[in-house]
């Protein structure tokens, strides 16, 4: 680590570990159990504390706060951690808080994500790869977000909710139920509006397969009879469609939340 990459006003606790070419800007504060891997850049006024690891090539902008204790009354100073992967862009005022005893003690963020201004990632969240969270997205604790999902600005997600891969949540949406993979949800109380067909096309999914999957989803959520029976019927009917299979797998997993449904 070259001292020329560390601004003279930065406060770095003894014990912090830096990789190669780490850059720390003015007035940053780094705790004693923080690990910054190669080419991490902290612009200025960034606070990183706790047992926290930041992956290589991640850039963090002013006034972000990473690794602070979770916002829960039952937190008892347990030594929980925050792990953030590589190639992330973390913009101004983003907060990512450490895990808790009730959630495995780790808040984990993957790689290649863009978190815009004011995003909050609560304790024990498990965040995937290649995501976009627009301005002021707020995630409560214990939320799981699959790869390539997009969450629109000022949306809030209820604790323990699952957001499936390639899904999209429109801006200003409160989400209190699980969002299926590829799902498109929005509204004052987030409802399923179909599949994220535009996003799927951009990611190279076959158009026919995507439209077939939309038909399958409509059969599951809008069909007659028992919901569980419809899942089984659709799983068999569309067993050769990998998109449908991914959605069915998601629906069959254990969850403490219900699912976002079409508006009745």
UniProtKB/Swiss-Prot annotation:
SUPFAM superfamilies: Trimeric LpxA-like enzymes. Its main location: cytoplasm. Keywords: Acyltransferase, Cytoplasm, Lipid A biosynthesis, Lipid biosynthesis, Lipid metabolism, Repeat, Transferase. InterPro entries: Acetyltransf_C (IPR029098), Acetyltransf_C_sf (IPR037157), Hexapep (IPR001451), Lipid_A_LpxA (IPR010137), Trimer_LpxA-like_sf (IPR011004). It is found in: Cytoplasm. It catalyses: a (3R)-hydroxyacyl-[ACP] + UDP-N-acetyl-alpha-D-glucosamine = a UDP-3-O-[(3R)-3-hydroxyacyl]-N-acetyl-alpha-D-glucosamine + holo-[ACP]. One of its GO terms (biological process) is lipid A biosynthetic process. It comes from the Bacteria. Its EC number is 2.3.1.129. Pathway: Glycolipid biosynthesis; lipid IV(A) biosynthesis; lipid IV(A) from (3R)-3-hydroxytetradecanoyl-[acyl-carrier-protein] and UDP-N-acetyl-alpha-D-glucosamine: step 1/6. One of its GO terms (molecular function) is acyl-[acyl-carrier-protein]-UDP-N-acetylglucosamine O-acyltransferase activity. GO terms for cellular component: cytoplasm; membrane. Pfam families: Acetyltransf_11, Hexapep. Involved in the biosynthesis of lipid A, a phosphorylated glycolipid that anchors the lipopolysaccharide to the outer membrane of the cell. Homotrimer. Belongs to the transferase hexapeptide repeat family. LpxA subfamily. NCBIfam families: lipid_A_lpxA, PRK05289.1. This is Acyl-[acyl-carrier-protein]--UDP-N-acetylglucosamine O-acyltransferase. It comes from Rickettsia typhi (strain ATCC VR-144 / Wilmington). The gene is lpxA.
């Amino acid at each position: 680590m070259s001292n020329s990459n560390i601004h003279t006003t930065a406060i770095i606790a003894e014990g912090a570990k830096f990789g190669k070419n780490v850059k720390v800007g003015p007035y940053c504060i780094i705790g004693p159990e923080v690990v910054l891997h190669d080419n991490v850049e902290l612009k200025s006024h960034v606070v990183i504390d706790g047992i926290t690891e930041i992956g290589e090539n991640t850039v963090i902008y002013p006034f972000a706060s990473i690794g602070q204790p979770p916002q829960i009354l039952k937190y008892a100073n347990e030594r929980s951690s925050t792990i953030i992967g590589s190639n992330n862009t973390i913009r101004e005022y983003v907060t990512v808080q450490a895990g808790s005893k009730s959630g495995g003690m780790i808040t984990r963020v993957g790689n290649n994500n863009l978190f815009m201004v004011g995003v909050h990632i609560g304790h024990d969240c498990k965040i995937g790869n290649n995501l976009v969270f627009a301005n002021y997205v707020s995630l409560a604790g214990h939320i799981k977000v699959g790869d390539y999902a997009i969450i629109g600005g000022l949306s809030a997600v209820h604790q323990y909710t699952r957001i499936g891969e390639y899904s999209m949540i429109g801006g200003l949406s409160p989400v209190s139920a699980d969002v299926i993979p590829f799902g498109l949800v929005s509204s004052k109380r987030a409802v399923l509006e179909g599949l994220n067909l535009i996003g799927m096309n951009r990611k190279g999914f076959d158009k026919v397969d995507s439209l077939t999957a939309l038909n399958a989803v409509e059969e599951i959520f809008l069909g007659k009879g028992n919901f569980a029976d419809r899942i089984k019927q659709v799983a068999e009917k569309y067993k050769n469609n990998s998109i449908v299979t991914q959605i069915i797998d998601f629906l069959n997993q254990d969850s403490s939340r219900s699912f976002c449904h079409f508006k009745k």
